[in-house]
Amino acid sequence: MTKKAKRNIVHKRFDSIVKGSQDTKKYRGLELTNGLRVLLVSDSKTRVSAVALDVKVGHLMDPWELPGLAHFCEHMLFLGTAKYPSEREYFKYLAANNGDSNAYTDTDHTNYSFEVRSEKLYGALDRFAQFFLDPQFTESATEREVCAVNCEYLDKVNEDFWRCLQVERSLSKPGHDYSKFAIGNKKTLLEDPRTKGIEPRDVLLDFYKNWYSSDIMTCCIVGKESLDVLESYLGSFKFDAIKNTRKERKIWKDSPFGPDQLAKRIEIVPIQNTGQVSIKFPFPDLNGEFLSQPGDYIAHLIGHEGPGSLLSELKRLGWVISLEADNHTIASGFGVFSVTMDLSTEGLEHVDDVIQLVFNFIGFLKSSGPQKWIHDELAELNAVDFRFDDVKHTMEKASILAECLHPKIRKNFETALKTSHHAFNLPEKNEYIPSKFDQKPREPVKSGYPRLISEDEWIQVWFKQDNEYNSPKQGIMFALTTPLVAKKSKNVVAFKSLDTIIEETYNARLAGLECQFESSSSGVQIRVFGYDEKQSLFAKHLVNRMANFQVNRLCFDISFESLKRTLTNHAFSQPHDLSAHFIDLLVVDNIWSKEQLLAVCDSVTLEDVHGFAIKMLQAFHMELFVHGNSTEKDTLQLSKELSDILKSVAPNSRPLKRDEHNPHRELQLINGHEHVYRHFQKTHDVGCVEVAFQIGVQSTYNNSVNKLLNELIKNPAYTILRTNEALGYNVSTESRLNDGNVYLHVIVQGPESADHVLERIEVFLESAREEIVAMPQEDFDYQVWAMFKENPPTLSQCFSMFWSEIHSRQYNFGRNKEVRGISKRITKEEVINFFDRKIRKGGAERRKLALGLWKK
């Protein structure tokens, strides 16, 4: 065991840290002699360690002559240090130890984080610490990484969210830091400064030396080691030696929205097919009000979706599709409260009326006054979540934003603020808030896997009681197999209207019940996960609403307008999202394109929707899986009640015949052949090349070797294609399991031509093979061990994993155990042979499908 550092590096200690009653982790707070604040978390059960360091400097501190410098500094910091000069060292170490990393630049802080196998925390922390002790910022990397930032800028420049945000910043108070251009690009970081005689690298070095000061840094380390050992690491890697330049955490005392910026109506023409109105109020920074959380209270009431709510009335009038209320601290010292609504076509003709109703509702809340029972209900929900927190690595929770609305508002709506509206009411009490958290009686049959406890021609019932997590939660998965859904594109669209059922689940979602309602070529799936006490009641409500689905004309019109807008806007998605969709269309049987669904939207009537559930239930089969804090008896009772609901709605229905099941199928590509497809998009200035290698039919062996191969080439792909060749900002490799087949994907999104990128991907694959060949046996063996070492999943993950086996009809619940067995036998020669046969150019079993997506 590593001994505690001999020198005294700690200035203050904080041991009385409040935690949830079910939290077994140990915590220690420290302030080092250089002012760095550290939270240590000892979790003896974890297999993955995590570290995050936050520097209180963001893009609001950019020098005016170099917009985007803080973001550029975040990019450059990773590219080598004095102790580890190789630009790949940090990423290579993490990749070899099944780790990952992330970083982002915000308004007033920049965050760096990584995770790694717990046994390798020591080495990862050593490499991580060097970024804040002695980074290189080499000249050779400077221009190359500017290109990477520019690619990131090009990725976002045609997204409506970023366009609107930049308009908001540009129209803020002149000279206020909020008006700066945050992301940066080649023009702001390289071309313009050099035109003015400014060398960007020199300014970058000054920025780092000035702002990367230990007294405005915080760090969290989560590991399986004891608190004393974790503390010793701080001394071993000289965290106390990070320079303290005596910086103060900057606080902006003035809002970027002064009298000249308020009471303004700004109209923006979107790229996507959308209509939205957002009302924003300057808000103070209320991060210190975490005990009362006034901002969350207001957002809860304005954003509520139940009867008597603002959204309910706006929907009744047919003006609004959705509404979100959010309180947000922009940076230390100032924030904003926003009410954002997606408008229907009718709503676009009534924008002023919509705004007036918002102010009416605010006036109603003001006249009603604060309600203690609502505050207590929110506190109760937070207390339950804190007690049974499923998050493995506890980090500092999001701060509470905002307290009160700014008094300076547009005069046109002052009268509305002073009056209420007859349709408004405070929300009803939430019937789904759980109060019982005890464990259900233990079943005499203890099994590590789901058991089939009942089966007939109508339904299969699977059950597994939780014996590992002792959690008051469970999952319910209900699948209704009916081939009618995917038979026609019109049926798929009609089914989509049933998604409005999810809009009625607001209280359940507030109470911690997750809900998903999905259609597929085989039928319908309803997934519910959360606290078990009210879950069966909720599941029965959902199935009953689906079977007896009725919706009024106005709701139908709004729902279908929303659906059409979603289908239309798919064409404006990021190129890498579009390429994934197009590849699925090429290889998966019996699925519909967004264009095909959009084409039939106008032909679907309200009568079609009302009659669809009955038609869907003419012939069907059910599967029910319950996993968690439940009993076999309760599960069988639930299965009976769900069956009774469906059979009562369609008394003349019949069980589905086995040959009527409609599983997904995929095309089998031909060995030795490659197919290249070209497609176009009209929105983004960057394109995407996605290369998919069809490995073959899913099997434990194919899945395992392909997953390992992906891990071996993931880091080289990022380094070679993104960092060295600057082909794009979004570069990744993925091992994917589709419907029956396993694939290896290489994805590059950037400004280069498709032909050039395809050529460079082939060159990269050859380089990646050479790296595997040259990899020392010890490193390969460790990579295999780290890749397949057992890592206990959460209850939710376990539930999803078991359901995947049931729904795919593979029933291999011990697959992970089989994978670990295979991993002990995999050799490097085997992986190289696998690569040569299935990936390498000229391979006997290579099946390559490439898609180039470019701007018209």
From Swiss-Prot:
It is an enzyme of class 3 (hydrolase). GO terms for biological process: peptide catabolic process; proteolysis involved in protein catabolic process. Coiled coil: none annotated. The active site is at E74. One of its GO terms (cellular component) is mitochondrion. InterPro entries: Metalloenz_LuxS/M16, Pept_M16_N, Pept_M16_Zn_BS, Peptidase_M16, Peptidase_M16_C, Peptidase_M16_M. Its EC number is 3.4.24.-. It comes from the Eukaryota. Zn(2+) binds at H71, H75, E152. This is Putative zinc protease C28F5.4. It comes from Caenorhabditis elegans.
